[in-house]
Amino acid sequence: MEWEAPALVLSASPYGESSAIVHLLTEDLGLVHGLARGGTARANRALWQPGNLIRASWRGRLPDQLGNLSGELVHGSAARLMSAPLALAMLASACAVADGTLPEREPHPRIFHLLTRFFSLLSLDPDMAGWGGMAALLRWEACLLGDLGYGMDLSACAVTGGSAELAWVSPRTGRAVSDAAAGEWRPRLLRLPPLFLDESDPGTVQDWRDGLRLTGHFLARDAFGQRHRPLPPARLRLVDMIDALQPGALHPDD
């Protein structure tokens, strides 16, 4: 059996003397694994960097076997972000989250297309990490949770049924709550940044912190928790990086 398709590199781990076990995300096959012979050799190492879009070729005897991978670079995101630490951290976090939550060989075309678009935007303008990149990443995490069956319901207030002034999310149910209805439960709720409700809103540094805490709660409890795994180190490093940012450092409206 063999196939060829555009694919995003999510991870590559050394195997043997010079090969690598590579995890890819494709539109039609979802998450797939393969053996890239010579993948850690100097001549091939750059191809298998997480975040790269490649034209992948997979060959194996059976679909569920670890087949042999080869590929050609279509768009190299990772190398373009080396001088932009925040953008690189965002890319690494997204790759690790997708790699750790998506089931193998289950198509998630929306997640593939959103992630491909996000990486392309980051690499075309790494500085956009402070002008909407974080908001795009957080919205992608929310979409991922939805596709995996753990989505939040941000359409209306769980208490009143209204759609105005939604400002909180129940950590138990994932349903939105308006600021007026939060009442004495406010300290127990997760803040809902406006960027989840308005795709034109890039958010502030505090919004990013609140957003990472919001999606991180459901990623940790549901997407990773159901697999008995912790949040990946790359996601935790991104949280630390955003926590260390000073208000106004990246966005004029902070």
Curated annotation (Swiss-Prot):
One of the GO BP terms on file: double-strand break repair
Keywords of this entry: DNA damage, DNA recombination, DNA repair
Entry's family note: Belongs to the RecO family.
Signal sequence, start to end: none
GO terms under cellular component: bacterial nucleoid
Organism (species): Gluconacetobacter diazotrophicus (strain ATCC 49037 / DSM 5601 / CCUG 37298 / CIP 103539 / LMG 7603 / PAl5)
Pfam entry (one): RecO_N
Role of this protein: Involved in DNA repair and RecF pathway recombination.
Protein name, as recorded: DNA repair protein RecO
